[in-house]
UniProtKB/Swiss-Prot annotation:
Residue(s) carrying Valine amide: V78
Composition-biased stretches (Acidic residues): 30-40
Name of the gene encoding the protein in the UniProt record: DRG1
Name of the protein in its database record: Dermaseptin-B7
Species: Phyllomedusa bicolor
Annotated InterPro entries: Frog_antimicrobial_propeptide, FSAP
Organs and tissues of expression: Expressed by the skin glands.
Region (Disordered): 24-48
Length: 81
């Protein structure tokens, strides 16, 4: 009976040790995944910022060109009269 108790305690102890090791590895993996997600989010934010800035610059250039064309057309129309 005593040897059965010792065996049972040994099995339970080894089970708890392996469980704690697995939980620790799981936490480490979750931390690594979280860091990767943070890095990807930062990259996306940076990329989106660059796209947004380029879009603004393109819109400004297009509006400036359209304004010059309209001004030229008005000037030509006034000059013809």
């Amino acid at each position: 009976m005593a040897s059965l108790k010792k065996s049972l305690f040994l099995v339970l102890f080894l089970g708890l040790v392996s469980l704690s090791i697995c939980e620790e590895e799981k936490r480490e993996n979750e931390d690594e995944e979280e860091q990767e997600d943070d890095e990807q989010s930062e990259m996306k934010r940076g990329l989106w910022s660059n796209i947004k800035t380029a879009g603004k610059e393109a819109a400004k250039a297009a509006l400036k060109a359209a304004g010059k064309a309209a001004l030229g057309a008005v000037t030509d129309a006034v000059g013809e009269q």
